[in-house]
């Protein structure tokens, strides 16, 4: 909600900075209002139309394609953002603030440099920015939307790229936002992102600079950005918050056309009323949603919509505007985050004022007007029986309690008095369960309640009812003093005291008021303290204490008295016990004597024990028995060393070995000699073989030689074979025949004789080859 507003305001600032002030005022807010009117019918329509124009105007889609690539991340980011549209949108806008100069106007001091950088970068690369923008505009909805998501979530990632790129992408995002308007679901994602809102303003501001020639696009972008911001998380978060279309928030933002984000801090009260008028009954939910974004309190808000819608609207808007004003730099938070935090701050700051200025401050400090009125009216209702005021107070209380989930705890305390208890109690139990999630509001609301309670108490001081109101008022101050629980007790006793003064009228009513008083007085102590002590679940403990406090309040007050009295008793009892303690002291001494350790204590220093140790040293006689007194003297090793020398003397054994000298040469001298002898044996064997040299060639040298011998025979055979060949022709050669035959006989192969000489030659060759192979 606040994001669109802040963005719009930022757009105004940027427009003024970039010379877009005219279009900003005319197209910015005017466009916002017009588009808000259009967006009332359908925020998405105007973005759709505008993107159509942008898309038609921009021919290129390259940048959009590049953007569509990161679109996956952007889509994932928007999906994540959809989970918590309001919160994530609030968180993202913060991250995006650096992206656009929007943060500047949001009130972030550093953003001016970002604006300068963005402006400088945009000025440096206006064409690239335009191309990116054109790409965004050109790209159809899904890629553009994804890029919008990209620019939304990536708003932070884009920042690293550079304010210039971030600005360009945001400016491009504006058109894509318009295209995103075409794609409603993606626009919703963009809305969740809320980055489009901020990026939209950069489009107007930095974008305006980047593409000065595309004023229509800038206007459309702004319009689309404004409308898309309206469509964007504000439309979702703000409907939950304000129940009204995000346009209302935009309109509220536009209602202050000259209201810059920085100047937004100053919001006129009339503006709140305007906002309230602009925000229909749907706004009641807004404050509650703004305070409890993810608490889904609209259901509870519906209960209270009847009575406090206007006040809540005004208050919610005032808180939202205050949030924007106080946190203009946090557009993402919007009135939701700002509303709560600023609302709390303004509430606390306005507590004195709210007590006095409750009518005017009421819109800003919802709890102030509601809670004090609830208290006063509730008191009057229970005691005066004023049905109308009580009903209003009740309804407002319910609404405020429900809307103010943290406030409900306060409201239950207020309703606790008398007859209003039954009606308010349901609201308090229903509302209180939720408050634990919003402890901040409780604290902020309580202070106002206290101030308003004081006022109401003063107003009712004239009547006996004021007495009852006074305890109630005291209880609300107790709420203020949740941190200061002591105040509650002090105020609580006055509460019972005041009713006694008006005992005549309220004798009968005193019991119920006393119950509520005790409930209020004590629950603030117990419940509020417990709740306050545990900020994580202050509402829940408060509601628990309140619920039981209703039945048990009377008992608690007496318990307080008893407890107060008991502490002094306990000290007295402790003193008596302490007195008794001295009596056992002598017993303890006796016990020590019984223990028989008194003497030991005296000797504890170890004097006697040490002497005993010395005596043990004197017992060295035992060592003398060992016959090693001398050795003991030489214990350091003297005697043992001598013994070592004796074994050295035992080297005679080595002499027996007859290798004393060799022992020194043990490294292998003698062994080497033995090896030499072995070599001799080998030589001898080889000599026997007659192949000592061949032994070196053992791998087959000797075999080869043997083969050579065979070869000699074979050579002869070969000669025979040659002869054989010749024999066929030279058969008459007898010597040739005989020699081969004899040779064949030597080989003892009669077949050779039978075989022809050529076959013998082949066989000889084969045999030689096989032998050679074997030898190898």
From Swiss-Prot:
Modification sites for Omega-N-methylarginine: 472, 684
Biased composition (Basic and acidic residues): 1-26, 179-189, 207-216, 314-323, 344-356, 381-393, 455-466, 517-528
UniProt feature, compositional bias: Polar residues: 61-71, 440-452, 736-751
Gene Ontology biological process terms from the UniProt entry: microtubule cytoskeleton organization; neuron projection development; positive regulation of axon extension; positive regulation of microtubule polymerization
Record cross-link Glycyl lysine isopeptide (Lys-Gly) (interchain with G-Cter in ubiquitin), residues: 44, 589, 594, 602, 616, 633, 646, 652, 656, 666, 678, 682, 688, 704, 710, 720
Biased composition (Low complexity): 324-340, 529-549
Modified residues (Phosphothreonine): 69, 71, 111, 470, 486, 492, 498, 540, 547, 552, 566, 738, 762
Phosphotyrosine carried by residues: 18, 29, 532, 729
Keywords: Acetylation, Cell membrane, Cell projection, Cytoplasm, Cytoskeleton, Isopeptide bond, Membrane, Methylation, Microtubule, Phosphoprotein, Repeat, Ubl conjugation
Post-translational modification: Polyubiquitinated. Requires functional TRAF6 and may provoke SQSTM1-dependent degradation by the proteasome. Phosphorylation at various serine and threonine residues in S-P or T-P motifs by proline-directed protein kinases (PDPK1, CDK1, CDK5, GSK3, MAPK) (a few sites per protein in interphase, more in mitosis), and at serine residues in K-X-G-S motifs by MAP/microtubule affinity-regulating kinase (MARK1, MARK2, MARK3 or MARK4), causing detachment from microtubules, and their disassembly. Phosphorylation at Ser-597 by BRSK1 and BRSK2 in neurons affects ability to bind microtubules and plays a role in neuron polarization.
Modified residues (Phosphoserine): 46, 61, 214, 502, 526, 530, 533-534, 537, 549, 570, 572, 597, 620, 624, 628, 640, 659, 687, 691, 731, 735, 739, 744, 751, 757
Residues found modified as N-acetylalanine: 2
Coiled coil: none
Biased composition (Acidic residues): 217-228
Location of N6,N6-dimethyllysine modifications: 480, 646
Matching Pfam families: Tubulin-binding
Modified residues (N6-acetyllysine): 480, 560, 594, 616, 625, 633, 646, 652, 656, 666, 678, 682, 704, 720
Highest taxon of the lineage: Eukaryota
GO cellular component: axon; cytoplasm; cytosol; dendrite; growth cone; microtubule; neuron projection; plasma membrane
Tau/MAP repeats (start-end): 579-609, 610-640, 641-671, 672-703
Signal peptide span: none
Domain statement: The tau/MAP repeat binds to tubulin.
Protein task: Promotes microtubule assembly and stability, and might be involved in the establishment and maintenance of neuronal polarity. The C-terminus binds axonal microtubules while the N-terminus binds neural plasma membrane components, suggesting that tau functions as a linker protein between both. Axonal polarity is predetermined by tau localization (in the neuronal cell) in the domain of the cell body defined by the centrosome. The short isoforms allow plasticity of the cytoskeleton whereas the longer isoforms may preferentially play a role in its stabilization.
The protein's name: Microtubule-associated protein tau
Organism: Gorilla gorilla gorilla
